[in-house]
């Protein structure tokens, strides 16, 4: 695939901005309370779609790493089907991890970057879910769920006004993204060296 994952936050930002602008135009003269209540229900659907997209992207990456390990150890070949136990193990792990450790990240995304109202939450989630589905099913491209939804939230917030976005929080997120890859590589190398020393491989 020719998809560049670093571009996807900007894709999410632009699409969420456009979707939110369309929502504002359509519901401009409607009762704000009724509109908010309607989007609160709609957000239940968009949140479920987003959760499914999260599993389709992030769980599949973990499955791929485990399957690659099995191939390298001679327990499987590239032509084999993905073992069912890997699918269930990764699905369970990502579900438990999201439920147990995702609260702080959800708070940062839902309240830290902007104050999300139901309409903006729906816009960000629906756009992000669409991007995740298209990249996973149509382009076979692994992308970051967090990067896509962050771009969507920024786009929905910018549509209101640029000053409504807490850009300092966004900069902190960018720093975290930049540090993740080298930190993960360094830790993986360290673990490998320890295993090599202990096992004598």
Model-based region annotation:
Residues 19-50, 78, 105, 111, ...:
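Intrinsically disordered, low-complexity non-transmembrane regions of multi-pass membrane transporters
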Residues 110-145, 173-178:
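Hydrophobic alpha-helical bundle architecture
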Residues 57-124, 139, 156:
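Transmembrane helical segments that form the transport core of multi-pass membrane transport proteins
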Residues 48-54, 60-68, 132-138, 144:
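Generic transmembrane alpha-helix signature in multi-pass membrane proteins
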Residues 9-21, 25, 59, 63, ...:
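Transmembrane alpha-helical segments of multi-pass membrane transport proteins and ion-pumping complexes
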Residues 41-44, 84, 88, 122-133, ...:
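Hydrophobic alpha-helical segments embedded in the membrane of multi-pass proteins
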Residues 155-173:
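Catalytic phosphate/nucleotide-handling subdomain of diverse soluble enzymes
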